[in-house]
């Protein structure tokens, strides 16, 4: 019986919202950076290589890697892009300046198909 009461109290405690409304999970919050221009690129655009080695030394991966202006978003920063998801700033580009993010895409075709979008961007903190 004591275990049941303890579990019930724990459940009620966890059910009470205690994190800010901008939170993406327990102990994780988002810091808004504003609207960014969002484009996409692929490794075949990078000096004819099949694998793109990022400015951080990692192999670029679709669904993870973004190129950023490191003066705006520091390398290694996790960001959430509205309607796209969470990505990591692992690359830069000579033309990527200011509020512009370039997503690494699965293919050159997908990168071109993505086009240019404008999305809200948040730095993900904590976790």
Q: Predicted segment positions?
A:
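Solvent-exposed, well-ordered loop and adjacent helix/strand elements within mature globular domains
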Residues: 2-4, 19-127
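Bacterial N-terminal signal peptides
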Residues: 8-16
């Amino acid at each position: 019986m004591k275990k049941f009461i303890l579990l019930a109290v724990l459940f009620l405690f966890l059910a009470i919202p205690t994190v800010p409304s901008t939170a993406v999970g327990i102990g994780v919050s988002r810091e808004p950076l504003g609207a960014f221009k969002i484009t996409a690129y692929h490794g075949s655009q990078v000096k004819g290589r099949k694998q793109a080695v990022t400015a951080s030394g990692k192999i670029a991966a679709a669904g993870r890697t973004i190129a950023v202006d490191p003066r705006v978003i520091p390398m290694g920063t996790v960001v959430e892009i509205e309607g796209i998801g969470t990505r990591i700033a692992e690359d830069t580009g000579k033309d990527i300046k200011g509020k512009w993010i370039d997503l690494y895409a699965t293919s050159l075709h997908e990168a071109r198909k993505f086009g240019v979008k404008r999305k809200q961007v948040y730095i993900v903190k904590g976790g």
